[in-house]
Amino acid sequence: MVASDEFRRVFGSFDQDGDGKISATELRLCVKASLGEDMPDEEVQALMALADTDGDGLLDEEEFVRLVTEMEADGDEEEDDDDETCRCLREAFAMYEMEGRGCITPLSLKLMLSKLGTHLDVAECQAMICRFDMNGDGVLTFDEFKTMMMA
């Protein structure tokens, strides 16, 4: 596996002692420096075990590149999951947003809830909206709806 210049640069910065290998300690220190978060020992050891294909307890450049590539691929899958969640939320939002205003109003909420068998008056719907109406305009935007649904 041929590492790109970017991977080589990152590998070089992680390999603090210049021995051509990244130890668990070097990995943890560099993750903390890069992300500002301390990585628990268990996570460091799990990453090392996952990537250390030759079993020497260290990551050479090829193992490091493979690890980073796999982590990027996992991140892409999470983005796909996020995209699917967002798509589903947009579909749900569209069901409640019936007035063509791009937001859920107390009336549109009342109408949809009635269709679903829950009968509330407009004031009760206003109270429901108020809990997640971040900007206080009396309606729910998609972002506010998303926050509500993810709570």
From Swiss-Prot:
PROSITE patterns: EF_HAND_1, EF_HAND_2. The keyword Hydrolase does not apply. Ca(2+) 3 binds at D133, N135, D137, E144. Ca(2+) 1 binds at D15, D17, D19, K21, E26. It holds the Pfam family EF-hand_7. SUPFAM superfamilies: EF-hand. Residues 2-37, 39-74, 84-119, 120-151 form the EF-hand domain. GO terms for molecular function: calcium ion binding. Ca(2+) 2 binds at D52, D54, D56, E63. Keywords: Calcium, Metal-binding, Repeat. The keyword Repeat applies. SMART domains: EFh (SM00054). Potential calcium sensor. This is Putative calcium-binding protein CML23. It comes from Oryza sativa subsp. japonica (Rice). The gene is CML23.
